[in-house]
Amino acid sequence: MPGYDDGRVACTDDEIVIRHYYLAGAKRIKYQAIREVRSVPLGTMGKLRIHGSGDLVHWFNFDPRRPRKDTALVIYLDGRIRPVITPDDPARVAAELADHGVRVTAGRESGLW
């Protein structure tokens, strides 16, 4: 698979780049640092979260198109904060992550309803 880039989320050869994660920049996460990525349905509260966190656990990058999306990918790292992304093609990002050895599961996530 040749990679992925929708302008907000990009999968490179060795990391995922989450643009507009911080007010003035991107967050780069090496694939080896990811414990798991969970694909979850995005409820009303998640759809309305354009940027930031409502529970101090899930952190959403800036995505003004999020209200029209139905699926989020929650990235589990070693720390308490879980980055949450809503790529334009979540299935393709999940496949790209799996191709790089990241465990990808599906389920539910409290705090995103």
Report residues per predicted region:
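Non-transmembrane, membrane-adjacent beta-strand/coil modules in membrane-associated proteins
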Residues: 2-7, 20-29, 33-80, 110-113
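Short, charged, intrinsically disordered terminal tails
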Residues: 99-113
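Bulky hydrophobic/aromatic packing residues
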Residues: 15, 86, 109-111
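A membrane-cytosol interface segment of integral membrane proteins
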Residues: 67-103
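Short, well-ordered beta-strand segments enriched in hydrophobic/aromatic residues
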Residues: 14-20
